[in-house]
UniProtKB/Swiss-Prot annotation:
GO terms for molecular function: translation elongation factor activity. InterPro entries: Elong-fact-P_C (IPR015365), NA-bd_OB-fold (IPR012340), Rib_uL2_dom2 (IPR014722), Transl_elong_fac_P/YeiP (IPR020599), Transl_elong_KOW-like (IPR013185), Transl_elong_P/YeiP_cen (IPR001059), Transl_elong_P/YeiP_CS (IPR013852), Transl_elongation_fac_P (IPR011768). PANTHER family: ELONGATION FACTOR P, ELONGATION FACTOR P (EF-P) FAMILY PROTEIN. Involved in peptide bond synthesis. Stimulates efficient translation and peptide-bond synthesis on native or reconstituted 70S ribosomes in vitro. Probably functions indirectly by altering the affinity of the ribosome for aminoacyl-tRNA, thus increasing their reactivity as acceptors for peptidyl transferase. It is found in: Cytoplasm. PROSITE patterns: EFP. It comes from Deinococcus deserti (strain DSM 17065 / CIP 109153 / LMG 22923 / VCD115). The lineage of its organism: Bacteria, Thermotogati, Deinococcota, Deinococci, Deinococcales. Belongs to the elongation factor P family. This is Elongation factor P. SMART domains: EFP (SM01185), Elong-fact-P_C (SM00841). SUPFAM superfamilies: Nucleic acid-binding proteins, Translation proteins SH3-like domain. One of its GO terms (cellular component) is cytoplasm.
Amino acid sequence: MISVTELRNGTKVEMDGGLWECLDYSHLKMGRGGAKVVTKFRNMETGSIVDRTFNSGEKLQDIYVEGKKMQYLYKDGADFMFMDMDTFEQVILPPSLVGDAAKFMKENTEVEVAMYGEKALTITLPNQVILKIVETDPGVRGDTVSGGTKPAKLETGAVVQVPLFVEQDTNVKVDTRTGQYLSRA
């Protein structure tokens, strides 16, 4: 159990029957009344965000979330198959858990999966991945004062904006957090 005054950004707790991550907190001291802690939490299972206010003496149950290195193997229908890099055990994760990360995952991509007990909570991709462009229009140099861009479809199906000089079948480095082109690889 931790006191609400010990909450920090990224602290993970169990409350209201769910697993929550603290996104923001502030400690407010009223003139005559007791201090209050105003927080913002994100549900780690559904992604919903709530604001909560606690009195300074309240306690919450903290949880330990373990990060496991896993490797994406393949897509099986709608589900995604991962392998634990330590035990070589295979785990099936639903598309609701993988979310937008699927746009930048190709086979054999190593990811970090946040686990609470035996339950997977979130997937974290590497900050940058190298993917191949499978479809893009030829770059037409026209009236562009500064560098123009064009859409390019990657091998995973994601579409990113790339500079005009980038051609089809080129490997590019993409930022997985923003989905933006970084450079040729």
